[in-house]
């Protein structure tokens, strides 16, 4: 194979003061282009060798839009709408309140995840956890379409009824007893997606995150958010290894991590020279590191959006695991202390939340 790297901007060139250091940069950068194509020895665990053999099933048919609209109207009446903005509405509901919408969530999950080399390969991505977890979803009332969703597990309720095995993350990681108390005060997040037609628009992910902050205000007994972020199997094992090492170097929490064991750990394989070169080029800057991944990966892949979003919310990384039931995507487990979420994220939502409380109080007094 012959591969040509991306142009090096004048700005990047000017970071080097002498020809020798610039030459060394060019030499290492050139050799780096080959790494995604290096074959992994058979005796080393590689996610490329763990492909699911079951062929993908045909995606389930969509149910009637009228059924979706009926459930949305019902949720509005019950006060389950967290916020609205222009043509968008964000709702938080239990599975029993949205049987038709939940079917659509599962359908769109599978379509969206398959597009990026993930997914269950089933006709619909619905499992036993969906029945007792809550669902945060974004509805476009103009198009009468579901745009995206998060699955949200309220830890206190889950632990009381099912114990630690009631959490989805326990299927991928072993959580030691020292963390059980923390999980009772944790909202578990997962299965996040935005459908392809809306992924380039800035509002959907922003509004879903506003919805998450609304939930933390409505349920103040929860002090943590926790969930997995997926690194698709479309990435080379080399890039996966780089991402994991970069995250561990800058966003790792060793205290919490000691109580979490991955059930199928991804084995990082990196040469020290490659690791040093990438880390020197990126420093601790996520944007620079994202650019490095873009240059290395032949498929124009970037660091998953959710990883970048969580890091901006002061998330900490605690473990990585290969998920064989999800097309061998690598799941990074991260958590956020609610008190650590930046004020720039919380304050606008706090104002909306306070205004909503005042509006409801006024309505009650007028009755």
Spans of features found by a protein language model:
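Non-catalytic C-terminal accessory region of glycerolipid acyltransferases
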Residues: 1-61, 275-281
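C-terminal/domain-terminus segments
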Residues: 15-28, 32, 208-209, 302-308, ...
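Conserved N-terminal entry element of GNAT/NAT acetyltransferase domains
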Residues: 57-96
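Short amphipathic alpha-helix that is part of the acyltransferase structural core
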Residues: 82-125, 131-135, 139-142, 147-148
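Acyl-donor binding region in acyl/amide transferases
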Residues: 120-123, 157-316, 321-331
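Short beta->alpha transition motifs characteristic of CBS
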Residues: 150-156
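Long, compositionally biased intrinsically disordered regions
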Residues: 331, 355-366
């Amino acid at each position: 194979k012959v591969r040509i790297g991306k142009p090096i901007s004048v700005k990047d060139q000017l970071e080097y003061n002498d020809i020798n250091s610039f030459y060394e940069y060019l030499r290492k950068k050139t050799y780096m282009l080959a790494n995604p194509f290096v074959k992994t020895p058979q005796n080393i665990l590689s996610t490329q060798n763990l492909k699911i053999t079951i062929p993908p099933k045909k995606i389930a048919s969509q149910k009637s839009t009228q059924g979706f609209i009926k459930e949305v109207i019902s949720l509005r009446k019950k006060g389950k709408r967290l916020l609205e903005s222009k043509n968008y509405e964000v709702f938080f509901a239990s599975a029993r309140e949205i049987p038709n919408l939940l079917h659509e969530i599962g359908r769109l999950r599978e379509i969206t995840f398959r597009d990026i080399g993930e997914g269950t390969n089933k006709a619909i991505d619905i499992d036993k956890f969906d029945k007792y977890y809550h669902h945060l979803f974004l509805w476009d009332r103009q198009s009468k379409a579901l745009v995206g969703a998060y699955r949200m597990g309220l830890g206190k309720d889950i632990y009381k009824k099912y114990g630690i095995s009631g959490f989805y993350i326990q299927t991928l990681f072993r959580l030691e007893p020292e963390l059980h108390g923390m999980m009772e005060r944790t909202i578990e997040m997962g299965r996040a997606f935005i459908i392809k037609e809306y992924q380039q628009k800035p509002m959907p992910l922003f509004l879903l995150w506003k919805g998450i902050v609304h939930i933390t205000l409505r349920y103040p007994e929860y002090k943590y958010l926790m969930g997995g972020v997926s690194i698709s199997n479309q990435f080379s094992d080399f890039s996966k290894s780089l991402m994991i090492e970069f995250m561990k170097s800058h966003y790792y929490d060793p205290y919490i991590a000691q109580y979490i064991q991955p059930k199928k750990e991804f084995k990082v394989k990196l040469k020290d020279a490659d690791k040093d070169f990438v880390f020197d080029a990126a420093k601790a800057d996520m944007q620079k590191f994202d650019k490095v991944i873009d240059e290395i990966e032949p498929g124009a892949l970037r660091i998953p959006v959710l990883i970048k979003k969580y890091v901006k919310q002061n998330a900490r990384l605690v473990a990585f695991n290969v998920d064989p039931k999800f097309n061998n995507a690598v799941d990074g487990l991260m958590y956020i202390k609610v008190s650590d979420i930046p004020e720039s994220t919380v304050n606008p939502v706090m104002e909306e939340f306070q205004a909503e409380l005042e509006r409801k109080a006024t309505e009650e007094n007028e009755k």
